[in-house]
Amino acid sequence: MSKLKKYSFSTFSITFLSWGMIAVYTQIKNIPFGSSIALYILYILGVIGPAIAGITVSKRSDSKEDFSMFLKSCYQPTKNLNWYLFIIVIVLVFSLLPYFVVGGEQIVLVQIILLQIPIFILIGGLEEIGWRGFMLRELTKRIPALTSTLLVSIVWIFWHLPLFFIIGTYQYEYLNIPVFSISVISFSFLLSTVYYKTKSIFLCIMTHAFCNSVLNVFVSNQSLLGGIIALVFSLFIYLLFVNNSNRSLIMKKVDTYIE
């Protein structure tokens, strides 16, 4: 079995087993998953399924040197501060542009964004060890970057599906699958941009956590238009910074400055 097949099997086994049990229990009892500590622990286990699978498969399949580099990329901060500024800007535009266009609600103080980041590193950010750190990396060895990003997006959408059946999740309460799917693809392109340009899993983790935190403060009205706006922006950023063909001289200078 190839590394990608092992990773996919492990990820979906961990997550679907954990979230599947929660979905069945919450539906039978008609209670939100957050009402039980045991259910919440199962929820977190499902969330970090991609990280567990990525680390496990990498340890068993890669050389000691490659595995060590993989782990280091997960926890070692990037020293170039320009990349952090880049991430802050693209995440804020990605999150707030739909909010201001289609409307929404600010549910807590802006200061909460920074305070929530550690929580969203655990609930969201660590996924990047598996999705971008392992799966995208392995796919890019075999197929073009754009195709790899699209494939990860599709798998990522399917991975989230149990959340739509768990009472108390944001997906169950507020989202529909088509709009959510567009949002996942949009976010995937943004994260791919960060990964392809930096090769840093740590920065992908921080990007995911920061974006989740912003979206938890500024909650946009769920609409097809909002999803399309986010998708257009993420594709724009991807094409500017990742697709090296037909790039303007100005954008190449911007790219050089960031690096």
Question: How should each PLM-predicted stretch be described?
Answer:
Residues 105-117, 168-182:
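Juxtamembrane helix-entry segments on the extracytoplasmic side of multipass membrane proteins
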Residues 17, 126-130, 134-135, 139, ...:
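Active-site His/Glu-centered metal-binding helix of metallohydrolases
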Residues 127-153, 196-203:
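Membrane-interface helix/loop boundary segments of multi-pass membrane proteins
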